Amino acid sequence: MNAQQPRAVRPAGLWPGAPGFHREVLRNPWYRLLGELQNSFNELTVEFWRRRGGQTLHLPITTGAVSSPIGLGSDSVPVRVDLGGAPTFLADSMQFTLELGCRMSRRACYYIMPSFRGEPSDETHLGQFFHSEAEIFGDLADVMRYVEDYLSYLAEQLLARHHSAVVNAAGDISHILALIGGDSFHSITFDEATELLDEGDIVDHGSWRTITRAGEQRLMQRVGSPLWLTHWDHLAVPFYQAFSLTGRSLNADLLLGPGEIVGCGERHIKAQDVRRALALHKVDPVPYEWYVDMREVDELQTSGFGLGVERFFMWMLRHDDIRDMQLVPREMGKQITP
């Protein structure tokens, strides 16, 4: 079915935690669909990695070594908490522990778990969201292929399981069918993107550049989507991404629907390269001494990715506000029940 259909199911838009929100969750079929998609997403992720020999890990949500610390290239603000009198952080990612898991198990490792960011929510960003993350053996090209296979598999299987409900919520499923049908994933370097975009789409910070959300949308319009945006300035990304031969970063963001839904990258192999990156990004090396030492013990080439689950659902349901992708809303700086 390619034609646009009326949207029979829509969210309430009652975030964050408006009085009676729990009643809306019980009444509105949007939230029932969301719960079903979440369940299927988890089941399908387990099956995807089972077929590829991957291993899941149960990891804590607190860490003393956030993957986006205060420093150049960090893409989020750490959430500091007090844990029995000890200052620590709610994890923005446990990617570093996935790297440890790869060395321990000699297998790809993955999880689906909450991610905490210290910024207010808006139309495309949640301060608390779910992250499907994995670390594999291989380089940047290898992990990009994993992501493409994973997204195509999720789209096909989720549509097969929930076809009628997805049509009722999205109104049009041509974008899903296109991805399932093998539409090519486009790819462009950050340097190439700057030649295609308008003034204001790229923000020049002096030693590094970033792209605006409007720039992401314009780039997809001009090049196509899904679109890989690769090889960013190294100071524009976190320190753990490996250096390319030209000094750029061996990383890639996948743009689809609301914008960036996947971030991935190749990791440093050698301890000396991690030390160099920490110094370049002006990050305190003390919490990451174990991360450096891990490479002294076992040098491996791994790469990893993180998929924002709610952003993926935004794309699938053709929705324009990620805050409607929460069964139980959360907002930075607010006490919300349930």
Annotate each predicted stretch with a short phrase:
Residues M1-F137:
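Class II aminoacyl-tRNA synthetase-like tRNA-binding/catalytic domains
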Residues V66, L151, S164, Q326-P329:
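Flexible domain-boundary/linker segments
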Residues L140-R161:
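Internal alpha/beta scaffold segment
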Residues R50-Q55, E156, A160-S164, I202-V203, ...:
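Intrinsically disordered or highly flexible coil/loop and linker segments, enriched in small
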Residues G73-R145, G182-P338:
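A translation/RNA-centric and nucleic-acid-associated enzymatic feature enriched
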Residues A160-T189, L196:
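Long, charge-rich alpha-helical interaction segments
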Residues N42, V46, R50, E148-A155, ...:
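Generic solvent-exposed, charged/amphipathic alpha-helical segments
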Residues N28-R32, E99, Y110, A160-H163, ...:
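Short, structured coil/loop segments at alpha-helix boundaries
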